[in-house]
Each structure stands twice: as structure tokens, then as C-alpha cells.
């Protein structure tokens, strides 16, 4: 719903690899399977698909899972808690269903919201905004914490609707374009080649704006309105050129809460390529902190591991986190927040939750080696195997 149907980062393994394989086989923008895509789409080209294609493939994958029940239009509005000493025990959630509250009991709950709201409602400690470098002895970052999160971007897709219309890439202000199956971004100096390729449909990072507090719906609405106002000139240029513009249903938010876990992943871990003893997912992507300059020689890093402790909130039982809300500094978060890595973390969290529930074992007592073996059997560690 934020229109980021574009893959970056890795490794692309497990269910994420399965998804993009189907996307490449049946849903390419050009209508033909990309022959260089390989198993992971790591062919040096940009690949993207229509957001609806993502939804279609995900629903098809869900249909194969007999033990998954999907419920739509039923937001979580509360968390069921038991208190024991200095710990909270999460025993399920409360949802709003057709205007009434309904409680759902669960041996384990996973917060995969992307904003950490469930963990927040459970009373978990969380981090928000920029830390100072000295807070975690990181070599990159800012000297004094300012509490700012990364800016938000309103994504969009432009599509030709008039015969022979040409994307006015040289007139659009602050907007390059992503053409599917191309090894570079489309910019003004590429216009002649762009006309020759004649794609006719492009993905754009529309307008980027700051939101003071991405936890607050009113401030998000104001940021979205600002982004729309800043888009107006380009929207008119697109329309005059014979292009329709499909705006994402809502503003794209990069960063909200980061739930503090038993271990806080830092830039040092990523730079060193640390693989902790309790690693449950691999990750590989550069530091990508929008709104902050990171020296080029430090920006690009190698593979690293996500430890189980980073998805285990402190002082809380019965709850795991998944995706971009896990326990990490803002700098580390800027790398792990992308789709393949979030998917890998999600698979690990789901597997750990199933082990805990089936064995009636606390999340802090599960056999980590057994968890790792199960994840390995699902191919989750295949991305870093030696060729």
C-alpha cells in the first residue's frame, strides 16, 4: 500500500525468493519472463512489479498454508497481558471486528506491524529517532541525539495513456524513474535511449518530506498533504505529456519504533559482519539512512547476522518482533529495513513462535540450535553458502 514493489538488499531466500520467482515468471511489467533474473534477481538490473501483482502472489502463497487464517479489516486495538514480577506476559490481542471487540488468545504473538504498535501497547521499551554515536559507540552517525526519524516518501507509478506519449523526464523536478529490467535509473540525460526502449511505465520516488513524529496519525496526514502539494507541478507535467499517475494509497514511512530487545544490533555489528551464536537470519545491504550523510567508504558493508535476542523484547514474555521494528540502532536499522531482510526475520520469528507453542516452551527457553537447523532446512541460510 506504499508502492515499493522494488527489491534491494538480500539475501533473497525462503518465501521471499519463492515470491519473486513467481513475480518474474508471471507478472513482469513487459509481459515476458526476464531470462537473466536467475534465482534471486541479482543480475545487476532494477526489477519492479505492479503492487497488485505482489498482492496476488502473496494471496496465492497464503492459500497453500493450511494453518494460516487470514482476517481483513480487523485492526488490533489492544493487547492481552498478564503481569508477573517485572515482566509482562502477552497472551493475545484484542481486535475490532464489525464494530465489536474480539479477543484472540495466543501462546505467542508476533509484532510484524512495521510500526511496533503491538509491542508498545504491551509496555515494551522502544527506541525512536536518532541516537548519538556515543550511545552505542558507533563510528557513524551524529554527535548529539536529535530524535529525528528518516523522512517519508510518497511513491507513485507513471503510465502512458496517450499514443506515442513520451515521459517528460527532462522536465520533472527532482524525479528520476525506475524502468523495469534496466541496469540504471532513468534520468534526463538518458532521454534518447529511454524513447528508443519505449517502456511506457515507470516507478518513481515521488516527493520526500519530514514527519516530526511518525507515531502520530495527525502529523503523518500533514506530511502526506505537504508531499501532495509538492507533487502538484510534476503531476501537471505528467498529465500534459499524456501520462496517468498512480499515487500510492498512503505515504511511505521508513522508520517508527524500534523495540528494544535482549540485544541491540549496532553499526559495529554490521561493519564487522558479525554472526552471533544465536543468528536466525542473514542480511546484506548498505547503510541507507535518508537525511544523513554517511562516508562512502563506510556506507557499503558485507553480510551480517540477525541474532535471536534482537527479536526478543526485554522484560516481556509471549511476544516476538519481526521486520524493521527489531532491536537495532537507527544506523543498523537503515540497512535491515528492506524487504528481503524483513522477510527472512519474519520466517525466523514465525518458526520460533511455532516451536515455542508446540513444545509449550517459553521463548527464552527454545533450543536455538534446533531453530537454526529448521531455518537451514527451509533454505534461509542458503544465500551466503559458498558457490
PLM feature spans:
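Conserved N-terminal/central alpha/beta ligand/cofactor-binding core
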Residues: 1-80, 127, 150-156
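Flavin (FAD/FMN)-binding glycine-rich loop and adjacent Rossmann-like elements that form
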Residues: 15, 30, 73, 85-92, ...
Amino acid at each position: 500500500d506504499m508502492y515499493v514493489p522494488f527489491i534491494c538488499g538480500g539475501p533473497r531466500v525462503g518465501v521471499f525468493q519463492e515470491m519473486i520467482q513467481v513475480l518474474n515468471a508471471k507478472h513482469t511489467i513487459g509481459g515476458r519472463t526476464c531470462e537473466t533474473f536467475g534465482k534471486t534477481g541479482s543480475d545487476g538490473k532494477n526489477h519492479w512489479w505492479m503492487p497488485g501483482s505482489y498482492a496476488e502472489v502473496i494471496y496465492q502463497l497464503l492459500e497453500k498454508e493450511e494453518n494460516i487464517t487470514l482476517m481483513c479489516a480487523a485492526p488490533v486495538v489492544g493487547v492481552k497481558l498478564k503481569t508477573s514480577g517485572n515482566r509482562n506476559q502477552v497472551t493475545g490481542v484484542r481486535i475490532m471486528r464489525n464494530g465489536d471487540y474480539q479477543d484472540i488468545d495466543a501462546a505467542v504473538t508476533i509484532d510484524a506491524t512495521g510500526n511496533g504498535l503491538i509491542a508498545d501497547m504491551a509496555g515494551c521499551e522502544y527506541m525512536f529517532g536518532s541516537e548519538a554515536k556515543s550511545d552505542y559507540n558507533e563510528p557513524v552517525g551524529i554527535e548529539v541525539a536529535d530524535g529525528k526519524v528518516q523522512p517519508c516518501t510518497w511513491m507513485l507509478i507513471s503510465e502512458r495513456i496517450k499514443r506515442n506519449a513520451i515521459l517528460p523526464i527532462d522536465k520533472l523536478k527532482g524525479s528520476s524513474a525506475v524502468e523495469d529490467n534496466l541496469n540504471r535509473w532513468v534520468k534526463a540525460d538518458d532521454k534518447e535511449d529511454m524513447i528508443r526502449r519505449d517502456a511506457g511505465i515507470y516507478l518513481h520516488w515521488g516527493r520526500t518530506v519530514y514527519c516530526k513524529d511518525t507515531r502520530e496519525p495527525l502529523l503523518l496526514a500533514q506530511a502526506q498533504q505537504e508531499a501532495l502539494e509538492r507533487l502538484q507541478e510534476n503531476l501537471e507535467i505528467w498529465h500534459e505529456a499524456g501520462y496517468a499517475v498512480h499515487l500510492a494509497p498512503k505515504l511511505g514511512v521508513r522508520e517508527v519504533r524500534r523495540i528494544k530487545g535482549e540485544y541491540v544490533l549496532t553499526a559495529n555489528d554490521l561493519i564487522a559482519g558479525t554472526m552471533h551464536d544465536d543468528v536466525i537470519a542473514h542480511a546484506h545491504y548498505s547503510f541507507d539512512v535518508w537525511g544523513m550523510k554517511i562516508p562512502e567508504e563506510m556506507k557499503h558493508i558485507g553480510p551480517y547476522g540477525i541474532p535471536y535476542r534482537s527479536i526478543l523484547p526485554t522484560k516481556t514474555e509471549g511476544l516476538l518482533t519481526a521486520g524493521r521494528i527489531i532491536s537495532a540502532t537507527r544506523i543498523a536499522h537503515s540497512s535491515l529495513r528492506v524487504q528481503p531482510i524483513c522477510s527472512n526475520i519474519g520466517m525466523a520469528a514465525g518458526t520460533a513462535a511455532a516451536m515455542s507453542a508446540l513444545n509449550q516452551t517459553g521463548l527464552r527457553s527454545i533450543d536455538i540450535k534446533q531453530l537454526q537447523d529448521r531455518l537451514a532446512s527451509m533454505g534461509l541460510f542458503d544465500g551466503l553458502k559458498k558457490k
